[in-house]
Amino acid sequence: MIGQLTGLVGQIEGERCIVDVNGVGYVVSASTRTLAVLPQPPSVARVLIETIVREDAIQLFGFATTDERDWFRLLTTVQSVGAKVALAILSANNPGELLLAINAGDKGSLTRAAGVGPRLADRILSELRNKVAKMPGGGGTVSAPGIVSGPSVENDALLALAGLGFRRAEAWPVLSKVLAENENATLDLAIRLSLKDLAR
């Protein structure tokens, strides 16, 4: 199972994007919220992945936060809520709004999503009311390249550079220098500056 992809963001179109990892382009479906925070191609990003295996296909669904991924998993436990409807709900409501809507029995917030009518909204409220106490309310760990420098940026940048064909032994000294000179570098900036030095 694929749980995360770190690679170059390729084409973003409709409700999906392509993430290029070491020359292999993975088609990832995502909510409009996740697609909106992805950097413009051909920048590097880390995307959390939920893999769904069916008889005729393997589908990858991407998320910018752990909260959004957890809500996707919870929503798809509801009868008649498939992956497409779950993404539509997450496009219409962020995790915090979903938590408030379900606790308040707010059917209108759910019916804003494509494919969710009053009857399905009632079912979602009924089935999830007792489950949302354990759900996150909208914080979470952003897994796009806006995180400032630290262990996460360092590790993700090394993984991305390895995915682009660079050995750790050659990438690590360059990346260390980049992060030392750019303390607040984002993941995308750290990788771009490292690639610039490695290409010399």
From Swiss-Prot:
The keyword Transcription appears for this protein: no
Region (Domain II): 65-143
Subcellular compartments: Cytoplasm
GO biological process, one term: DNA repair
The keyword Nucleotide-binding is assigned to this record: no
Stretch list, region Domain I: 1-64
The entry's keywords: Cytoplasm, DNA damage, DNA recombination, DNA repair, DNA-binding
Region of interest: Flexible linker: 144-148
GO cellular component, one term: cytoplasm
UniProt note: domains: Has three domains with a flexible linker between the domains II and III and assumes an 'L' shape. Domain III is highly mobile and contacts RuvB.
Job description of the protein: The RuvA-RuvB-RuvC complex processes Holliday junction (HJ) DNA during genetic recombination and DNA repair, while the RuvA-RuvB complex plays an important role in the rescue of blocked DNA replication forks via replication fork reversal (RFR). RuvA specifically binds to HJ cruciform DNA, conferring on it an open structure. The RuvB hexamer acts as an ATP-dependent pump, pulling dsDNA into and through the RuvAB complex. HJ branch migration allows RuvC to scan DNA until it finds its consensus sequence, where it cleaves and resolves the cruciform DNA.
Protein's recorded name: Holliday junction branch migration complex subunit RuvA
Gene name of the record: ruvA
